[in-house]
């Protein structure tokens, strides 16, 4: 046996020991590079909208749970707002309740909103909190109704009929936030816990509203003056006309991108959510690819984040 392959009492070879040391040195270098970022975000609140492929892929969801636990461990205060569209659709199909969508929003009657609340607040919410708990942190699942977190009203939308006349759309119990009371989030975060929020709100008369998770996350990020709103999506971020990722936009540049058509389709409401978040108090918002493992850590703790950052004025 050559010297490079000689065995040590523990059973490893010289090559094994060298590789182990190299890997350890690489990990140490990564930690050292992250130190300035750890200092930058210590004590800050980061709101994460969790959904899309990152939520249904086991490997990505487990990595997400560990990443959020790590954020809390290093002094960041994460607040998670999750979606659950596929899980809602599956339950409605199982119950033989048909779904109708208008502009990507599920028309929600009184019976359906009960099912949606059951799935979001009762099932998905606890699954997401469980991922974080399994990673060693302490997460608590709540809905927007708890502690009066999200007060909502019926979402107002209009459309034009075949004759060109504008008419109001009745989306049922689809809501939009009118007020965010973050005290329950502060109480949980201040006690060392990680809030995990199901996007369900309560109306002035006590009625329940189904709220788009992006919209809920943006409203919460603004209300808590989050340092970052991280929007996990199934796309790399905002792309230019050539298909290249745009790493950063000012709010004005983002608005011009929408007006010019560079930002189009399903990216428009995501960018508008980011704009509303930074307008109402968040320092910056990031649309990033949740299909990339450890996307949140890469965005916060490296120079080259994997998404598009939108800053306020």
Swiss-Prot record:
Reaction(s) catalysed (UniProt annotation): N-acetyl-L-glutamate + ATP = N-acetyl-L-glutamyl 5-phosphate + ADP
Record-level GO cellular component terms: cytoplasm
First-listed, main subcellular location of the protein, grouped into a coarse class: cytoplasm
Keyword DNA-binding assigned: no
Metabolic or biological pathway, per its Swiss-Prot or TrEMBL entry: Amino-acid biosynthesis; L-arginine biosynthesis; N(2)-acetyl-L-ornithine from L-glutamate: step 2/4
InterPro entries assigned: AceGlu_kinase-like_sf, AcgluKinase_fam, ArgB, Asp/Glu/Uridylate_kinase, Glu/AcGlu_kinase, NAGK-C
SUPFAM superfamilies xrefs: Carbamate kinase-like
SS bond list: none
Keywords noted in UniProt: Amino-acid biosynthesis, Arginine biosynthesis, ATP-binding, Cytoplasm, Kinase, Nucleotide-binding, Transferase
Metal-binding found in the keyword field: no
Pfam families per record: AA_kinase
Transmembrane segments: none
Leader sequence residues: none
Recorded GO MF terms: acetylglutamate kinase activity; ATP binding
Ligand binding (substrate): 84-85, 106, 210
EC identifiers of the protein: 2.7.2.8
GO biological process: arginine biosynthetic process via ornithine; L-arginine biosynthetic process
Location of this chain's protein in the cell: Cytoplasm
Marked site positions, Transition state stabilizer: 49, 270
PANTHER family recorded: N-ACETYLGLUTAMATE SYNTHASE, N-ACETYLGLUTAMATE SYNTHASE, MITOCHONDRIAL
General function of this protein: Catalyzes the ATP-dependent phosphorylation of N-acetyl-L-glutamate.
Family membership: Belongs to the acetylglutamate kinase family. ArgB subfamily.
Protein name stated in the entry: Acetylglutamate kinase
Annotated organism of origin: Gluconacetobacter diazotrophicus (strain ATCC 49037 / DSM 5601 / CCUG 37298 / CIP 103539 / LMG 7603 / PAl5)
């Amino acid at each position: 046996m050559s010297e490079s392959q000689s065995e040590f009492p523990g059973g490893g070879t010289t090559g094994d020991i060298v590789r182990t040391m190299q890997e350890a040195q690489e990990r140490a270098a990564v930690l050292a590079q992250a130190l300035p970022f750890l200092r930058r975000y210590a004590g800050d609140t980061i709101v994460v909208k969790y959904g899309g492929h990152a939520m249904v892929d086991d490997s990505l969801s487990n990595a997400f749970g560990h990443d959020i636990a790590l954020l809390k461990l290093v002094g960041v205060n994460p607040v998670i707002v999750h979606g659950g569209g596929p899980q809602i659709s599956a339950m409605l199909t199982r119950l033989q309740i048909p779904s109708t969508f208008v502009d990507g929003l599920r028309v929600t009657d009184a019976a359906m909103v009960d099912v949606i609340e059951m799935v979001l607040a009762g099932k998905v919410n606890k699954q997401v909190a469980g991922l974080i708990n399994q990673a060693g942190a302490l997460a608590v699942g709540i809905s927007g109704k708890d502690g009066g977190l999200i007060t909502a009203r019926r979402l107002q939308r209009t459309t034009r009929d075949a004759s060109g006349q504008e008419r109001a759309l009745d989306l049922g119990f689809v809501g939009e936030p009118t007020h965010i009371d973050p005290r329950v989030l502060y109480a949980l975060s201040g006690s060392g816990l990680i809030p995990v929020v199901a996007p369900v709100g309560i109306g002035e008369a006590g009625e329940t509203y189904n709220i788009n998770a992006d919209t809920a996350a943006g409203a919460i990020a603004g209300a808590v003056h989050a340092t970052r709103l991280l929007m996990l999506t199934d796309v790399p971020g905002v792309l230019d006309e050539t298909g290249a990722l745009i790493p950063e936009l000012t709010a004005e540049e983002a608005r011009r991108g929408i007006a010019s058509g560079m930002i189009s389709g399903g990216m428009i409401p995501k960018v508008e959510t980011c704009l509303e978040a930074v307008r109402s108090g968040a320092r910056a918002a990031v649309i990033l690819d949740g299909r990339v493992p450890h996307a949140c850590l890469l965005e916060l703790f490296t120079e080259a984040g994997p998404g598009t950052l939108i800053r306020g004025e």
